[in-house]
């Protein structure tokens, strides 16, 4: 049977891999399907034609990979099924329309590129109802990095979103669009999903760091195929905690680990006469956790997440600095969770009007956004802390925190 043939092939690969040369971990760029590990629930929801339309979360959490995987699994032109992935970073609604229509035109789904979103809507309805010669049983538009697009659409009363929604409603589950991004996707979700607008009709999904089980699988499964074993659950937990359960950072650590093992083999530090599994020494693994490039990459990813709202007065970064100042006043050991008025008090002390001019309600909304981005965690009483203690450490020492806050003080 096909299953038996596939099983034999997998077993053959599993037996041969420990004696070969491979690098399964890829920290940037395209991730091959066999390295798509975890996110099964999120993947199923996005593939569902009635599933979520808004996808948001911090950087390095795998939103783009999710959308690309959906495109890979759902794109079957031979079956009249199409799933297109678009990266529209920095594009406004006009540029996004040009990119989307251009791809559909190149694939023979539309004959002429529309000049407006309204024209695009009419063309899609004609396509999906069979008025063109091209038959389409399913069409998915997976639109990534949609933040600028959403800002642009907001200035036009969200007309492009209404057009996409109308196509979906018209098509009887044969059309779906997905908008993925960071800051603006979150803000639209918070402000409008519950209101009587187009966003009130759109479901959403928040992509968070990996669960422990998914993170373990991403780290250990490729290593096991290569014949390596990490014997201690304690060191596994230490590694995953250091990566903050970010898939991209787990891939980065795995890549560094494989490169280091290859170098050790070259130096004959491993006894090649032994048979797999080859047990990786705990000291060896912990040394890699202090690798300069690895630590720099962790901090870089954290800072990128904080700076997603650079066009919006650096609110996230400022709030994180104020939170770090609260920690520093307790010698890095907070005795309580902090509320918006605690953050405002720090801003008052340093004379930062960008924060003091905000109402407590708006400040809390921003802190909720930071919780959605996994920077903060919130307790039942409405208090906040850094989601991981390492986030506080990445803000720098007390002197750096104070200096940065002073830089934002009003002149």
Residue ranges and their predicted role:
Residues 8-58, 65-73:
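Walker A/P-loop-proximal flanking segment of P-loop NTPase domains
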Residues 80-113, 126:
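Conserved NTP-binding/hydrolysis module of P-loop NTPases
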Residues 206-235, 253:
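Conserved small helical "lid"/interfacial subdomain of P-loop NTPases
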Residues 390-411:
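Short, amphipathic alpha-helical interaction segments positioned at domain boundaries
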